[in-house]
Regions:
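Catalytic alpha/beta core domains of metabolic enzymes, predominantly
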Residues: 270-294, 303
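Short acidic/His/Gly/Ser-rich catalytic and metal-binding motifs that mark active-site loops
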Residues: 133, 250-255, 323-326
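N-terminal [4Fe-4S]-dependent radical SAM core
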Residues: 54-141, 145-155, 403-409
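Catalytic cores of alpha/beta
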Residues: 225-236, 292-310, 368
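Core AdoMet radical
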Residues: 144-164, 169-230, 234-273, 285-287, ...
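Active-site-proximal loop/turn and secondary-structure-junction residues that shape catalytic pockets
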Residues: 125-129, 184-186, 222-226, 248-250, ...
């Protein structure tokens, strides 16, 4: 049988079929093809010794139809049946928040403004990434943002709507983290600074800080070094966290699958911004995001090390061939290779003494760093690291309570 993190990786890589005995439409959250499309799966919670593991399981993609993993339901609840050996893993299907079906004061369904992915709120605040509008399109080949905006979510978000949804997520779902993201908006063109993603996020960050509270993260296309004042302005407005999707360490894979990013700032531009914000905000406040399963595994490991060396922590997404992307027919990654990647992730975080898993933020779209400890044989050093993280979680509780309160930036 698999341990919880191994099962999580299996579910990400193989997807899952849903048995006729299940009533997920009534019992669970709706499938949310928002933002880049990674939330296209069914949200599950896997029991684990330290805390439940959230996972957004692929169920609609083509590869999931052949999965040996099947969600079943009986009188005791839900479970995942592995048809290869007959093992059944109990799981929980979290119910959909009541606020998903309510309307904002402007009449928009709240779930078209933002959705929970784990216990955090994700909001795409701007219109579609402009790489989709170039001719020929220069969008990342694995992304579906340009096809989701305006169909599965509002194409442009009203500030008041976002605040109302963030309040509902805080008060009714216990969310402590709001994550705002945008795509490319001519960040390499100085005279178009007013439409840069960071500038578009600024009023949302300020309003959420002053009226909602909690932790606020921003993911936007990096600006060149001469415009790093845009990061300073967002920090002043109340941003706590920045994430940078540089996607691939292998230069050939990066250029082939991320043509827009390669032709504008390139990989180095992402790292310059990552290093700058990591120095401004401190350890644990900046992440570099990389995709595992499309480039050589050793390149992904080097990318993890490079992110750590930049003063950030690595967020590793397992490649999902989402419907509507150029790569929708590509095979998903091998789970064994992914276990190798995430074992390396744990060792890199441990060796750098990164404060992972300190805040009560659960992300269902990725295998979180703190979950990967069970992929590595315990040593005295890893136990010491675990003890330190446990102590930090206790120390952080008053800070989390303070951050949850709205305040002027």
């Amino acid at each position: 049988m698999f341990n919880p993190v191994e099962l999580e990786i299996e579910l990400f890589c193989r997807g899952m079929r849903i048995d006729a005995s299940c009533e997920v439409e009534a019992d669970g959250r709706r499938l949310a093809r928002t933002r880049a499309g990674l939330g296209s799966g069914l949200e599950l919670m896997l029991p684990a010794p330290r805390k439940p593991i959230w996972v957004n399981v692929p169920v609609v993609e083509r590869f999931a139809e052949a999965s040996p993993l099947r969600l079943i339901k009986d009188g005791f609840g839900y479970g995942v049946l592995d048809e290869r050996d007959g093992a059944v893993y109990p799981v929980e299907v979290p119910e959909e928040p009541a606020w998903y079906s309510r309307l904002t004061s402007s009449g928009v369904p709240m779930c078209r403004i933002g959705v929970l992915q784990g216990n955090y709120l994700g909001v795409y605040v701007s219109n579609a990434c402009l790489f989709w509008a170039s001719k020929p399109p220069r969008a990342c080949r694995f992304c579906t943002t340009g096809k989701n905006l305006g169909v599965n979510e509002q194409p442009r978000k009203n500030l008041e709507d976002v605040v109302e949804v963030a309040l509902a997520a805080r008060d009714e779902s216990g969310s402590v983290f709001t994550h705002l993201n945008t795509g490319y908006h001519f960040e390499d063109v100085d005279k178009l600074e007013p439409i840069h993603g960071l500038r578009q996020c600024e009023p949302f960050v300020r309003a959420i800080r002053e009226r909602v509270g909690g932790f606020i993260g921003v993911q936007a296309f990096p600006v060149p070094e001469r415009l790093f004042c845009e990061y300073d302005a967002l920090i002043e407005a109340g941003a706590d966290h920045f994430s940078f999707c540089y996607e691939f360490e292998d230069p050939e894979t990066f250029a082939r699958l991320c043509p827009g990013k390669a032709e504008t700032l390139g990989q180095e531009g992402f790292f310059r911004a990552m290093e700058y914000t990591a120095k401004k905000l401190g350890p644990g406040r900046v992440s570099g995001e990389i995709i595992a399963g499309l480039e050589p595994i050793e390149a992904t490991k080097r990318g993890i090390d490079r992110i750590v060396a930049a003063g950030a922590f690595p967020t590793v997404c397992i490649f999902r061939p989402t419907i509507g992307s150029d790569l929708e027919n590509a095979p998903p990654p091998d789970p064994k290779a992914m276990r190798d990647v995430f074992a390396h992730l744990w060792e890199a975080c441990r060796d750098a003494d990164l404060p992972v898993g300190v805040l009560p933020i659960e992300v269902s779209l990725v295998v979180q760093a703190e979950e990967t400890r069970d992929l590595v044989k315990p040593t005295f050093g890893s136990r010491l690291y675990d003890w330190k993280l446990a102590a930090l979680r206790q120390v952080a509780r008053p800070y989390v309570a303070w951050k949850r309160r709205p305040r002027a930036a």
